[in-house]
Swiss-Prot record:
Function: Participates actively in the response to hyperosmotic and heat shock by preventing the aggregation of stress-denatured proteins, in association with DnaK and GrpE. It is the nucleotide exchange factor for DnaK and may function as a thermosensor. Unfolded proteins bind initially to DnaJ; upon interaction with the DnaJ-bound protein, DnaK hydrolyzes its bound ATP, resulting in the formation of a stable complex. GrpE releases ADP from DnaK; ATP binding to DnaK triggers the release of the substrate protein, thus completing the reaction cycle.
Cell compartments where the protein resides: Cytoplasm
Native organism taxonomy: Bacteria, Pseudomonadati, Pseudomonadota, Betaproteobacteria, Burkholderiales
Molecular-function GO terms, alphabetical: adenyl-nucleotide exchange factor activity; protein homodimerization activity; protein-folding chaperone binding; unfolded protein binding
The name this protein goes by in its record: Protein GrpE
Length: 184
C-alpha cells in the first residue's frame, strides 16, 4: 500500500472530525417534511390564528359593551348627584308651606334662604345663571331678544331682563330673555 491510500486527503479528515457536520447530515432527513405533514402543520397554524382572532374579536366586543354600560351608568348617576343637592331645597319649600306664620318679612327671609340653597345646588351641578346687566352688549349666544325698544343706550344693548337664562357646564340650557335697544 502506498501512503496515499492509508491517509485520507485533508478534506475528508475535516469532514469526519467535525461532529456538527455529521449531526446536520443526520438531521436533514428528519427536517424534510412530507406534504401531508406540512398541510397538517399549516392547518394547525390556521386553527390557532382563527382561535386568536375569535378571542380578540370577543374581547373587543366585551370592551365595547362595557364602555356602553359605563356611559349609561355615568348618565344615570350624574343626575343623582344633582338631585341630592336639590333635596334640601325641596325640604325648605315644604317647611315654608307648612307654617302658618302670617309675617311676610319672615316668609320673605325664608324664601331668600331657600333661593340661596337652590343657587348653591345649581353651582354644585355646574349650572350658572345668565343675568346680563342693563347696558351689556346683546350676545345672541346667551341672550334671546324679545323686543327692540327705542332707548338712549347704544344700539343692541340690553335694556331690561325679562327672564334669566342658565348654562350647564358652559352649554346654554336656556338663554336670558331680554329687551334690547333699537338702532337709532
Amino acid at each position: 500500500m502506498t501512503q496515499e491510500n492509508q491517509n485520507p486527503p485533508p478534506e475528508q479528515e475535516d469532514v469526519a472530525a467535525d461532529p456538527q457536520v455529521n449531526e446536520a447530515a443526520a438531521s436533514e432527513p428528519a427536517a424534510v417534511k412530507t406534504p401531508e405533514q406540512e398541510i397538517a402543520d399549516l392547518n394547525q397554524q390556521i386553527g390557532e390564528l382563527q382561535d386568536n382572532f375569535l378571542r380578540a374579536k370577543a374581547e373587543g366586543e366585551n370592551i365595547r359593551r362595557r364602555a356602553v354600560e359605563d356611559i349609561a351608568k355615568a348618565h344615570k348617576f350624574a343626575i343623582e348627584s344633582f338631585a341630592e343637592h336639590l333635596v334640601p331645597v325641596t325640604d325648605s319649600l315644604y317647611a315654608a308651606l307648612s307654617t302658618d306664620a302670617g309675617d311676610a318679612k319672615a316668609f320673605k327671609e325664608g324664601l331668600e334662604i331657600t333661593l340661596k340653597q337652590l343657587l348653591s345646588a345649581f353651582e354644585k351641578g355646574r349650572m350658572t345663571e345668565i343675568n346680563p346687566a342693563v347696558g351689556d352688549k346683546f350676545d345672541p349666544h346667551h341672550h334671546q331678544a324679545i323686543a327692540s325698544v327705542p332707548s338712549e343706550q347704544d344700539p343692541n344693548t340690553v335694556v331690561s331682563v325679562l327672564q334669566r337664562g342658565y348654562t350647564v357646564a358652559d352649554r346654554v340650557l336656556r338663554p336670558a330673555l331680554v329687551t334690547v335697544s333699537a338702532p337709532k
